[in-house]
Amino acid sequence: METLKTRNIQVEAIKQSPTASREVEIVERKGIGHPDSVADGIAEAVSRSLSKYYIKNYGRILHHNTDQVEVVGGQSDPRFGGGVVLEPSYILISGRATSTVNGERIPVKSIAIKAAKDYLREHFRDLEIDSDVMIDSRIGNGSIDLRGLYDTRKFKANDTSFGVGFAPFTDTETIVKATEKYINGDLKKSLPQIGYDIKVMGFRKNRTINLTVAAAYVDKYVKDPDEYYSVKEELVNKITDNALKYTNNDVQVFVNTGDIKDDKVYYLTVTGLSMENGDDGSVGRGNRVNGLITPYRPMSMEAAAGKNPVTHVGKLYNVLSNIIANDIVKEEGGDIKEVLVRIVSQIGRPVDEPHVASIQVIYEDNVDPSKHKNNITAIADDRIAHISDLTNMFVDGKLDVF
């Protein structure tokens, strides 16, 4: 029987305006094809592949962190009707992973390169993996003797760090995330001219939400400037219609505001990715684990993608904080306007015994916080107790980290 643990969970009612009711709000999302997101996606894909290999061959996930991926932009010559990639982008995978177990070598670098290629092939249809990118692995080596490995049921935090989460999303946050998902999802069927490097910046002033969208075009699907601008107009209309599904606020949409028709300046690419022409990327420089960059909310600067999913609290606690915040809002009904969660680790402590879990709640007017405090504490305690459940969800690709 599991020993009951007394966790340091602090629940506090705070009096401040929730984000949704403030005069100004700014929210950003870097789409899956943005160079920073490409780095995140590859880092996480490599971690998943290594984890699966370790589990299959050794029965457990061995130590690794593959959170150092750099995307170095190439050079291209995009043209209406189809251009060419002149120099491939360069992708460097680094970090550290267990490469020797009981004297037996593990093909870490081969696993990493295959994972990166598979990820790119799965997500970016117009990228020629063999010619448009160069992928290199410089993952550092580590070795262990499994006979002396510590009990996996007693995993300790490998860092003193913190995770941050909040709920619920505001309309602006919901729309910014949904817009990128829409453009890189269902919209591809009707507008194949639009590539995967999408960035959405949301700016709300009172009850008007402005969306500025940078959308890379794929040149071979666009015959001339007239078609470019026709697609642009259609894109504005479709984004607007989709955004209005999520809000009663006014929505204004701007697409590729850097275009200059008279000077023949367009956002054209060969592959649908700006990394083909000098745009670089790094792990952790883009979206937080909830898929957004939110300067009006508390955030952690931790790079979660590629970190090991067993003991790295920078990954676990950021995702867990968001789960706890959302579950509190869901289970405690309409009395809550906003929940902020921060979980702090202390190196050497079990990951399910954080140094503190701080939960701040903004309630609706005339609500007695004492009605909810015990339930909120219980929700947080339960989710922390089951933090190990997140590991398999990371390995199975069921949890996003960017």
UniProtKB/Swiss-Prot annotation:
Family, per entry: Belongs to the AdoMet synthase 2 family.
One Pfam assignment: AdoMet_Synthase
Top-level enzyme category: transferase
Function: Catalyzes the formation of S-adenosylmethionine from methionine and ATP.
Keyword terms: ATP-binding, Magnesium, Nucleotide-binding, One-carbon metabolism, Transferase
InterPro entries (UniProt xref): AdoMet_synthase_2, AdoMet_synthase_2_family, AdoMet_synthase_3, S-AdoMet_synthetase_arc
Pathway assignment: Amino-acid biosynthesis; S-adenosyl-L-methionine biosynthesis; S-adenosyl-L-methionine from L-methionine: step 1/1
Record's keyword annotation contains Magnesium: yes
Protein name: S-adenosylmethionine synthase
Documented EC number(s): 2.5.1.6
Binding-site residues, ATP: G140, N141, G142, S143, I144, D145
Co-factor requirement: Mg(2+)
Catalytic activity: L-methionine + ATP + H2O = S-adenosyl-L-methionine + phosphate + diphosphate
Biological process terms in GO annotation: one-carbon metabolic process; S-adenosylmethionine biosynthetic process
GO MF terms held by the record: ATP binding; magnesium ion binding; methionine adenosyltransferase activity
Lineage: Archaea, Methanobacteriati, Thermoplasmatota, Thermoplasmata, Thermoplasmatales
